[in-house]
Amino acid sequence: MSESLQDIALRMVTTGKGILAADESTASIKKRLESIGVESTPESRRDYREMLFRADAMRQSISGVILYDETLRQSAADGTPLRQLIVDAGSLIGIKVDTGTSPLPNFPGETITEGLDGLGKRIAEYHELGARFAKWRGVIAISNGLPTWGAVRSNAHALARYAALCQAGGIVPIVEP
């Protein structure tokens, strides 16, 4: 690997810059676009993302951009891969790798994050496509009697496996509990 995990992590936390979360799912971006009267199509989603990634502020303010799988594979109207726009702006490419949550069996009201199956292969593909960091979201319910130790332990185990797979694949893991 040409760049160490430490080098990537240091670039992510560059003073005065932040990480842009542009990893909204197709359903989430549909709501965002429809709220301003724009139909959600592959083209309108591409145009919205292209506008973000071509903004002058990208170079000055953004150290990395978390993408959704669709975005990582999309190209701008002129054919330039959107991921290249991010790199050209001096930012790192990140990717959301969890696939959402599902109810945690035997733990009413609690969830487990899905996406570990096949993650090693996906990490290798994402690295090949230019991703250098990833995000995994663990959702822990906090209320009267929650979280239970079993749910915390199950989610911590999933987060640890995700982080280990990322590191083995040359990608810095962001752990978002």
In which residue ranges do the predicted regions lie?
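Alpha/beta catalytic barrel-like cores
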Residues: 1-129, 142
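Surface-exposed cleft-lining segments at the edges of enzyme active sites
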Residues: 109-110, 140-152
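Conserved, mostly hydrophobic/aromatic
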Residues: 41, 136, 175
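Short glycine-centered, acidic/aromatic-flanked micro-motifs in structured strand/loop junctions
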Residues: 97, 138, 177
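Structured alpha-helical segments in the cores of large, soluble enzyme domains
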Residues: 119-133, 155-171
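Broad hydrophobic/π-residue packing in well-ordered secondary structure
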Residues: 36, 134-136
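Hydrophobic residues within beta-strands of alpha/beta enzymes
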Residues: 65, 134, 173-174
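Conserved strand-turn element in the central/C-terminal portion of the radical SAM core barrel
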Residues: 143, 173-177
